[in-house]
């Protein structure tokens, strides 16, 4: 099956082209709407880049398909079986991948207040393709869908009940496509059906989230109504006392919009040590920088708290899974997270295995560990392809 995976951002368009679940080519278009837009095509181990003027997402879609045809990657759009779209927020409506039609488009539009930075761009990509190539099947894959299996007591906030009914205030969770992918890969590695496994998955990148998976289903996750809740992240605060916000409004004369921007873009690792690149933070810590040390210790401590909470919730944990840019590449972070968990949780990391874990799935626990510890590179695009194929296959 030939599937194009599309991720439309506010000023960018990223796509990957798959044939039978094998990635063939990728195209990235950045700085859409600016005088000089940047386009990168990666195909057959070669990279072609150039600058041009891409005025809007309509132009970007035209550029994308022109590149694919000019490079003889496809001969015509009609040979595609479907386009799979990454949609950040599915709200309470979507718990699975969905074939896109007019009704689905309007439901995604209604969710813009829940994801004002992402859903409008995601929607624009859908609408441009629907207009230019109306016969091309499109499937929406939602970042929030995997977490729709959370029980009510985990998904609700202890706020007035009316806020849920009137404003849909509840926990939705994010990174669902990544957590779903690595959970399935963990089941393959463990040679057990996913429905029998209890897992804690840690997606650690610039954005970070933890998920408790019981018998293959998400029962809790660290991100909430927005991706701001939960773990300390690259530039997002994660969990804080909500009373800090009105306190800052009163005492520092900062408006809510400024605080919102601060919590999302100037907090987390960046807020504590001025840097959100974990490699540089570790290097500076080794050079004796105390703010970098503090930032890393805070980062690890908060991950440990979630592992402890989720271990109690799950009862027993078959595997702890690290993924995402930091989870896959920062051996020191993995070591610090697992340190001290031997007695209570039976989590014992083997340093040699951990230090040598590179670009492929690896088991990094010792023989004595009661819990498997896995490093699994995530592949959200492949997961979107697989979910898209399921929907399209049902139409045949």
From Swiss-Prot:
Protein location: Cytoplasm
Superkingdom: Bacteria
The entry's keywords: ATP-binding, Cytoplasm, Kinase, Magnesium, Metal-binding, Nucleotide-binding, Transferase
Coiled coil feature spans: none
PANTHER family in the record: ACETATE KINASE, ACETATE KINASE-RELATED
EC number(s) given by UniProt: 2.7.2.1
Protein known as: Acetate kinase
Feature type site, description Transition state stabilizer: 175, 236
One Pfam family it belongs to: Acetate_kinase
Record-listed Mg(2+) binding positions: 7, 380
Gene Ontology CC terms: cytoplasm
């Amino acid at each position: 099956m030939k599937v194009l995976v599309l991720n439309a951002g506010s000023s960018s368009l990223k796509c990957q082209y798959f044939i039978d679940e094998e990635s063939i080519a990728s195209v990235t278009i950045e700085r859409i709407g600016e005088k000089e837009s940047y386009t990168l095509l990666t195909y057959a181990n070669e990279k072609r880049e150039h600058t041009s003027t891409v005025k809007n997402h309509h132009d970007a879609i035209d550029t994308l398909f022109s590149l694919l045809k000019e490079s003889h990657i496809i001969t015509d759009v009609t040979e595609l079986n479907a386009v799979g779209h990454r949609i950040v927020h599915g709200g309470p409506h979507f718990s699975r991948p969905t074939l896109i039609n007019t009704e689905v488009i309007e439901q995604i539009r209604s969710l813009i207040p829940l994801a004002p930075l992402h859903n409008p761009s995601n929607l624009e990509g859908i609408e441009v393709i629907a207009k230019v190539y109306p016969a091309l099947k499109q499937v929406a894959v939602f970042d929030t869908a995997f977490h729709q299996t959370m029980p009510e007591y985990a998904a609700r906030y202890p706020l007035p009940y009316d806020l849920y009914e009137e404003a849909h205030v509840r926990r939705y969770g994010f990174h669902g496509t990544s957590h779903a992918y690595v959970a399935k890969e963990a089941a393959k590695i463990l040679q057990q059906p996913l429905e029998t496994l209890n897992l804690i998955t840690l997606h650690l990148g610039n954005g970070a989230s933890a998920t408790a998976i019981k018998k293959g289903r998400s029962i809790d996750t660290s991100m909430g109504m927005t991706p701001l809740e939960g773990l300390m992240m690259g530039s997002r605060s994660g969990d804080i006392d909500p009373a800090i916000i009105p306190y800052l409004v009163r005492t520092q004369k900062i408006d809510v919009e400024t605080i919102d921007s601060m919590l999302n873009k100037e907090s987390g690792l960046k807020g504590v040590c001025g840097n959100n690149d974990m490699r540089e933070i570790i290097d500076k810590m080794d050079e004796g920088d105390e703010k970098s040390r503090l930032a890393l210790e805070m980062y690890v401590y908060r991950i440990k708290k979630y592992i402890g909470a989720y271990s109690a919730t799950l009862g027993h944990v078959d595997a702890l899974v690290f993924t995402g840019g930091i989870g896959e590449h920062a051996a020191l972070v993995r070591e610090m997270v697992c340190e001290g968990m031997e007695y209570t949780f039976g989590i014992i990391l083997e340093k040699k295995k951990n230090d040598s874990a590179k670009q492929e799935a690896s088991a990094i626990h010792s023989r004595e560990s009661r819990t498997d510890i896995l490093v699994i590179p995530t592949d959200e695009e492949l997961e979107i392809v697989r979910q898209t194929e399921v929907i399209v296959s049902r139409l045949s």
